[in-house]
Amino acid sequence: MTVPDPARRDRMIQAVRAYFDACNAASRDRFAAVLSDDCVHWFPPEAGGPYLGRDAIADLWIGFVRAKGSRWTIDRLVCDGEEICVEWTHFKPNVGERIRGSEWYTFDAGGKIDGIWAHYASPRDPDRPANELEGFDYAARAYPTAAPELDAELGTERERNLANEPSA
């Protein structure tokens, strides 16, 4: 068994956290810093995708921020030194929804994210404001249940980035 390189592991974790910051900031520059040009993002059936390439992924999440006020949290993160698995919450405050899921991340030789596999608890049900595991007490386990406030710097960056994006 190969012993994971702690420095590589730390860079991978930083890249995934920076990816979530890119989503929350709606920042093409931040996406460029962490996603490979040919990154692929796969989704469950009927959820769209796969999205091929960094620009397609950035377009997707910037569109969600613009339309739904989307915000994401990392609720759990596991890294074995080769891949990362994240459990997350995607808040959509403009439409009163949230969805929880998990994703696997792979990385290219340069340390950029080159693959993302999204898994949801169930297919997206538009009649439910919270698509979550049935009977799982998120609040008791200290999961967020409301969209987080963005820190002032990230919020300002987000507004600036959205102002510079063409409207859909």
Give the label of every model feature segment:
Residues 2-6, 10, 48-51:
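Charge-dense, low-complexity intrinsically disordered segments
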Residues 40-61:
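Short solvent-exposed beta->alpha transition segments
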Residues 28-32, 58:
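An amphipathic alpha-helix signature
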Residues 11, 15, 56, 97:
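Soluble or luminal CAZymes and related metallo-dependent hydrolases
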Residues 17-24, 33-47:
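Short, solvent-exposed secondary-structure junction/capping segments
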Residues 2-7, 42, 59-168:
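A beta-strand edge to alpha-helix "cap/lid" segment located at domain peripheries
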Residues 8-26, 149, 153:
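Short, aromatic-enriched amphipathic alpha-helices that serve as compact interaction elements
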